[in-house]
Amino acid sequence: MPGVETIKSSWADEVELDYGGLPPTTETVENGHKYVTEYKYNKDDKKTKVVRTYKISKQVVPKTVAKRRTWTKFGESKNDKPGPNSQTTMVSEEIIMQFLNSKEDEKANDPLLDPTKNIAKCRICNGEHWSVNCPYKGTAMDTNLMEKKASAAAAAAVDAPKSGKYVPPFLKDSQKGALGMRGRDDTAAIRISNLSESMTEADLEELVKKIGPQSKMYLARDKNTGLCKGFAYVHFKQRKDAAAAIEILNGHGYDHLILSVEWSKPQNN
């Protein structure tokens, strides 16, 4: 019987047999970098070589963290090297914790320091905006508010002597009434300033007619342009109505401006 001839295999087949199919994973460290080389099969069942490069950096950590990293691993990671294993461990997003002391916590809970809270308060609808920007300005809600304030101011002026409280001098002399040459009570005159240039007599009458009856109104106008100079005088028939007008209109928002209302100073004859 003739002898069986030995067929020599190729070098690649011998290497594949020696490594059991795939070469082992290797790790090398050079110049502060760690290179991990591994082999695997791709979708076409061909061997591929994958090289991962890691940059080695030193980090100062608390003692408890450093001690925890020396704990003995167990389970499937019993024989793993120090550090996370990509096959069994997934590193998630880093979360930074911030600790506040008691003083910072008190400041955070202070309602006055809260930027989300608006310090402005509307006098018409009690909203968190200035009265000049109120969407209900000039509507029935604004008119009702002015009527309520006028009634409250008039009632306070009448009931003040009965209650025994302090009565301003102008209310004490309201019954006397200093009449002028034309029968007009100059002590019941007020001056309204900070009016817009587009102000008209009709607007002025609309502004004060709900407070009380008037005997005369004067809107200062420029002789050349005919525009409002920014102030006006209103003479009420009763001094208590003039006092109510000052209480209601002083600081009131009108036509994107804040009105300033005060008693009219008597002219020196």
Swiss-Prot record:
Residues annotated as domain RRM: 188-266
Stored CDD domains: eIF3G, RRM_eIF3G_like
GO cellular component, one term: eukaryotic 43S preinitiation complex
Name of the protein described by the UniProt record: Eukaryotic translation initiation factor 3 subunit G-1
Highest taxon of the lineage: Eukaryota
The protein's assembly and partners: Component of the eukaryotic translation initiation factor 3 (eIF-3) complex. The eIF-3 complex interacts with pix.
GO biological process, one term: formation of cytoplasmic translation initiation complex
Coiled coil feature spans: none
One of the Pfam families matching this protein, by short name: RRM_1
Family: Belongs to the eIF-3 subunit G family.
Compartments where found: Cytoplasm
Signal peptide: none
Keyword Ribonucleoprotein appears in the UniProt entry: no
HAMAP family linked: eIF3g (MF_03006)
Function text: RNA-binding component of the eukaryotic translation initiation factor 3 (eIF-3) complex, which is involved in protein synthesis of a specialized repertoire of mRNAs and, together with other initiation factors, stimulates binding of mRNA and methionyl-tRNAi to the 40S ribosome. The eIF-3 complex specifically targets and initiates translation of a subset of mRNAs involved in cell proliferation. This subunit can bind 18S rRNA.
A GO MF term: translation initiation factor activity
Primary location class: cytoplasm
PANTHER family per the UniProt record, alphabetical: EUKARYOTIC TRANSLATION INITIATION FACTOR 3 SUBUNIT G
Key words of the record: Cytoplasm, Initiation factor, Protein biosynthesis, RNA-binding
